[in-house]
């Protein structure tokens, strides 16, 4: 419904535009082109933190995940207004290792540091929690690679 209303509005705007982009009154939209007020609210239940974590761990633990799905998952996860739990990052790092994608491991760790923002205690905590996984998988942190000085 909203998409149709927006399309009608966009079509109406382009049909009224003259050759130089100026509006003229040669053709005014009829009542069908009026924008309708639509409320875009979710009617579903809220996802708990545990369900959110489980969903992302399951996503990254898929045995047949490919490089595109990995990057898509990382990009989506980074857009959230939160620092992912270490167990989600652990699953993502293991997926990177399965795909031999070292660059993505560094990118994930840099994104976690960036998402922590001014809260300087978060990133060291995450690295501390991930240290066994980092050692097991042979992954160096951006600081160990000297990327924090670049």
UniProtKB/Swiss-Prot annotation:
Keywords carried by this UniProt record: Acetylation, Heme, Iron, Membrane, Metal-binding, Mitochondrion, Mitochondrion inner membrane, Phosphoprotein, Transit peptide, Ubl conjugation
Membrane topology according to the record: Peripheral membrane protein
Name under which the protein is recorded: Cytochrome c oxidase subunit 5A, mitochondrial
GO terms for cellular component: mitochondrial inner membrane; respiratory chain complex IV
Transit peptide as recorded in UniProt: 1-41
Organism domain of life: Eukaryota
One annotated GO molecular function: metal ion binding
Residues carrying Phosphothreonine: 141
Localization: Mitochondrion inner membrane
Biological pathway: Energy metabolism; oxidative phosphorylation
Subunit-structure text: Component of the cytochrome c oxidase (complex IV, CIV), a multisubunit enzyme composed of 14 subunits. The complex is composed of a catalytic core of 3 subunits MT-CO1, MT-CO2 and MT-CO3, encoded in the mitochondrial DNA, and 11 supernumerary subunits COX4I, COX5A, COX5B, COX6A, COX6B, COX6C, COX7A, COX7B, COX7C, COX8 and NDUFA4, which are encoded in the nuclear genome.
InterPro entries: Cyt_c_oxidase_su5A/6 (IPR003204), Cyt_c_oxidase_su5A/6_sf (IPR036545)
Modified residues (N6-acetyllysine): 87, 113
Job of this protein: Component of the cytochrome c oxidase, the last enzyme in the mitochondrial electron transport chain which drives oxidative phosphorylation. The respiratory chain contains 3 multisubunit complexes succinate dehydrogenase (complex II, CII), ubiquinol-cytochrome c oxidoreductase (cytochrome b-c1 complex, complex III, CIII) and cytochrome c oxidase (complex IV, CIV), that cooperate to transfer electrons derived from NADH and succinate to molecular oxygen, creating an electrochemical gradient over the inner membrane that drives transmembrane transport and the ATP synthase.
Pfam family, one: COX5A
Modified how: In response to mitochondrial stress, the precursor protein is ubiquitinated by the SIFI complex in the cytoplasm before mitochondrial import, leading to its degradation. Within the SIFI complex, UBR4 initiates ubiquitin chain that are further elongated or branched by KCMF1.
Species for this entry: Pan paniscus (Pygmy chimpanzee)
Location of the motif SIFI-degron: 2-17
Family: Belongs to the cytochrome c oxidase subunit 5A family.
A Gene Ontology BP annotation from the UniProt entry: mitochondrial electron transport, cytochrome c to oxygen
């Amino acid at each position: 419904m909203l998409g149709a209303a927006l399309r009608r509005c966009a079509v109406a705007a382009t049909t009224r535009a003259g050759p130089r982009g100026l509006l003229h009154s040669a053709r005014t939209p009829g009542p069908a082109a009026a924008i309708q007020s639509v409320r875009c609210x979710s009617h579903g239940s809220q996802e708990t933190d545990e369900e959110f974590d489980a969903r992302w761990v399951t996503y990254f633990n898929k045995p047949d995940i490919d490089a595109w799905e990995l990057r898509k998952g990382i990009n989506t996860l980074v857009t959230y207004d939160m620092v992912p739990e270490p167990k989600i990052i652990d699953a993502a790092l293991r997926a990177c290792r399965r795909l031999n994608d070292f660059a993505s491991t560094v990118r994930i760790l840099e994104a976690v540091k960036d998402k922590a923002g001014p809260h300087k205690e978060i990133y060291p905590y995450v690295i501390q929690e991930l240290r066994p996984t980092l050692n097991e998988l042979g992954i160096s942190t951006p600081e160990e690679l000297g990327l924090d000085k670049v």
